Structure formats: structure tokens, C-alpha cells
Amino acid sequence: MTPPRALPPVWGRRAAGASALWGLILASCSLPSLLRRATEGPAGAPDPLFVLGGAAVPLVAGLAIASWAARPRPWPGLRGVLGLGGLRRSAALLPCGFFAGLAASVPMAGLFLLAQALLDPLGFAPEPQPAVAWLMDPATPPAAVAAIALAAIVLAPLAEEILYRAMLFGGLAAQGRPVRAALLSSLFFAALHLSVAAVLPLFALALLLCALWRRWGLAASFGAHAGFNAANVAVALLFS
């Protein structure tokens, strides 16, 4: 298996900086809704088109940043930067990554419970992410449930793997210190989800995704991320 092509150091810095800036923009856009939810309680069910559109924006931005970093050879360079192999290779890696993500959801759930137990004495009452809360609400219409599931399992993982693994981790790793790149990008990824109780499991998940992306490319890390999110969607629907 051919690993992703390393970005030149100067492009690595630019790609990492652009991805970090975009991640901060996304987090700042979602912060008001999280604060409103914490003070006013859950809002009504979202519009399905709004959910899909909101998930598509980071994906388009990630592809734009990756295409910019891959210049002057947009398609061959983009494949190399993202770590995309041939169709057969991707078709084989996707299901392997998916089942790895499903399996990883078990220890990650344990880390979440551990973090929650440590935070409870400090007065932290972790709120579920808005998407999880909507999935667990029996009043959420089926169309909204389907849109949230599609965004959570396909669109969001693909966007985040491009932004945080290929661009941020890959860009930082191009400076020659992949371990530091994995730690920094994983901490950034976990923090931007704006959930104190989820920082520990998401940090561990991100480290796993960095390792998968560095060794096998985008198909493996995206498959694992999709599998992890699919397990969370299934659990949320089970308890709805």
C-alpha cells in the first residue's frame, strides 16, 4: 500500500493553517446554538435540507483547500495529498476501515464514561451533541432523522478527514515531526467539537484516524470515522 504523498514543508504549513482557520470558523458558528441550547433547552427539529447543506459546506471547503495545496497538478496532486489510491484499493479499504471504526466505538464509549465520571464531581453535566439529541427525540420527523444520519455517517466524516487528517495532520507532519503533528491535530479536532466530556474519546479516536490515514490514506480513515459515527447513530436511535 502506498502512503499519502507528503506535502512540501511550505505547502504543508499553508494547508495546516487554512484547515485550522476553517475549523475555528466552524466552531465559532456552532457555539451560539450550543449556548442557546444550554440556556433555553432543545430547539425544534431541524430542516433536512439545512442539515445536509450545513454538512456539505465543510466538505466543499476541505476539497477547495486540498485542491489549492495540490497545485499545480489539481487531480493527480489532489489524489496524492489526500492519499487516494485506485478504485480497487479504496473499495477494499473502506469496509475494513468501517469495521475498525465500529470496533473502536466500544473503547471510546468507555473513555467517554470515564471522562464523565471524572467530570461529575466538578459539576459538569455533559449535554449531548445537538445531532444526537435530535436522533434521540421521538418527535424528530423521519426525513430529519435520515438527513442527520446521512450527514453524520457520510458527509461530516469525509469533510473532517480531508480537513483534519489530510490537510491539518498531513500539513503538520510535512514539517518532519509526525508524532507531534498527530497530537496537535487530534487535540484540535477534539476541542472543536465543543464537548468537555467528549474530548478524551475524540482525542483517542483522532489519533487512530491519523495512524490509519498516514498508513493507508483517506479511504481507511474515512471508513473508520464513518463506522464510529454509524455506531453512535445506531445507539442514539436505539434509545430514542
Label every model-predicted segment.
Residues V106, A133-S240:
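Transmembrane helix-loop-helix hairpins at the membrane interface
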Residues A56-V60, R89-C96, P128, A146, ...:
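A generic structural signal for ordered alpha-helices
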Residues Q116-P142:
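Membrane-interface interhelical connector segments
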Residues P48-V51, L122, T140, A190-A191:
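A generic short-segment signal for beta-strand/edge and adjacent turn/coil regions
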Residues T39-G41, L52-A55, P126-Q129, E160-E161, ...:
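N-terminal start-of-chain detector that recognizes signal peptides
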Residues E40-A43, L119-P126, G171-V179:
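Membrane interface segments of multi-pass transport proteins and intramembrane proteases
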Residues M1-A109, L113-L114, L218, A230-S240:
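N-terminal, membrane-interfacial amphipathic/helix-forming hydrophobic leader that caps
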Residues F99, A103-G123, L150, A159, ...:
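Hydrophobic alpha-helical segments embedded in or immediately adjacent to the lipid bilayer
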